Amino acid sequence: MAEKHGNLSINSDNLFPIINKWLYSDHDIFYRELISNGCDAITKLKKLDMMGEYELPADYKPQIQVIVNPDEKTLKFIDNGLGMTADEVEEYINQIAFSGATDFIEKYKDKANDDQIIGHFGLGFYSAFMVADQVTIDTLSYKKNATPVHWACDGGTEFDMTDGTKEGVGTEITLYLNEDCLEFANEYRAREVIEKYCSFMPTPIFLSKANAETEYETIDAADKLDTDTVVEEIHEEAKTEEKENENGEKEVVEVSPAKEKLKIVKRPVPLNDTNPLWAKNPKDCTDEEYKEFYRKVFLDYKEPLFWIHLNMDYPFNLKGILYFPKINTEYDSIEGTIKLYNNQVFIADNIKEVIPEFLMLLKGVIDCPDLPLNVSRSALQNDGFVKKISEYITKKVADKLIGMCKTEKESYEKYWDDISPFIKFGCLKDTKFCDKMNDYILFKNLDDKYLTLPELLVKEEEKKDDAEVLDKDGNPIANTGDAAASDNTADGSDTSADSEKDERKVIYYVTDKVQQGQYIKLFKEQNMQAVILDHNIDTSFITQLEQRNEKYKFMRIDADVTESLKDETSAEDLKAETDALTEVFKKALNNDKLTVKVEKLKNENISSIITLSEEGRRMQDMMKMYAMNGMGGMDMNMFAADQTLTLNANNELVKYIFEHKDSENVPMFCEQLYDLAVLSNHPLSVDEMTKFVERSNKIMMLLAK
């Protein structure tokens, strides 16, 4: 071939600065592009062999070599794929590659950074000019009697193409790195980038350093391969020891036989796994393989709870593995990572257009060869095909969870505390997921038993008829069913006058078993139940459940004093106590807005209870959540929940205050009763606690006199 000097049909003053601007944050991506090109060339050559258009050598081993040379500031990418002729270099490098790069830049040069190309695919070979002042290609086509070609370009508008000297079929690309990118000639940096993008590419990738000292290893002679370079044969003598036999006589015993070993040049080890676990049939994978893959990919040495192996060929090709990690705190789940691959080539983490947002809480890999990559994120958002992928993934996750609940209930319950934030978040974010999961969400009750929502409602309905109710002395009394018949709660208890307006079943819940211990004790004495909802997400979750289903509502255990906790007494019977005690407590506490109720509770040991309206508390909780997420700025007191102080007319101390309301110590007793009630509901402030301790000391001094 005659030497050719030509001009590229593009203004490089426009192209390369834009490439650098576009890909600056991911300027290591050229590794992936060049190695991917090598993989494609090898795949095509193997297909030609399968079709009978080319015969591969018997000892052919597909591979890609990456050679770093820090001394010469170069980086080589060598593949033994199908190579190129001069005409193909002209077509694929001088015309198509540059043309494709030009179209790419022209289409997306005005896009904002948050609308970038998915994975930056499309630039291919010319991504090399992000880091190199000059790039050369040496290639030899598989075609019979092909002539090797040498091509060179310094990133300007000109290139040189001549006959080359390459002897083996394939392509060698050499990058002469610019001064700002010499890090990529470092062996450890190269390894890091290759493992980032190419850990699972389908062709073995080998990394080496030019002019490095030869490394050796020793193997058993029986393990020698034809490709091994033997440096030395080693004979190890048998090892013997002197031992006493059964007769007490000493004799020489062989403890290790003689061995023949070989010192060989260290065998190269590929950096990648060419057959990743997700590409295998799930039936052929063991639990240990799944766990090992998880540790390797996510560097997490805590075992995952369980996993879902996705394997679909129609109507689109998608494979992957999603892991449910073990969560140590309620915040751990936000650290999930879903890695997206295209034909085993890493694209990016957490592509929200493809992967449902709530799945980002998991860890996993998804490989979808059919995914369109040379489009912007905004295009993906509106792509019906991508939406189907997202819906399929969501469906498979729901199917797995439902299947576990039905057939592996014990395991499902064991995992529930870890996976419940994920499932609840998914229900909040995805209506279809919520519809499927609605009857398989578990609630843990005060006895640490897990029940689905339908089971919970049925169980509590049954308790209305069977409950053993206790009187104020703790003795069982007959349950005629009349009280239950008047109840509208899932626990067999009327909530308040509101129950006349709202016929929903009430599900009581607890957010802190320690803080709300007094209320729990009252419930258990009357054989009532509540569920535990102690995660930040639960307020939003139960609100959504109520909006979707009018059959039930949730109420925190301290939101009201239910009828089942009271003796049967009319409000008229307690009018005198209510009027007097309301006046005394409002005056003692200097709080005219305080709502005071007087009830006869069955447990006479409890003097007072603070209740907060459910609606007000939920608003408070939501405002706290906004503040935690940096969305504060509003006065939290604006959303203070309405408090009600309920005094127990059966309690001796309350009786004393009523009978001695003019006593000089009564205001102090009122303050103490109020603080005791508050303590059972939420912690006191520093100032409130200081006053509480001082007051307690005064009361003890009175008792000591």
Regions found by a protein language model. Give the residues of each.
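GHKL (Bergerat-fold) ATPase N-terminal catalytic module, capturing the glycine-rich phosphate-binding loop
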Residues: 1-185, 192, 199, 215-217, ...
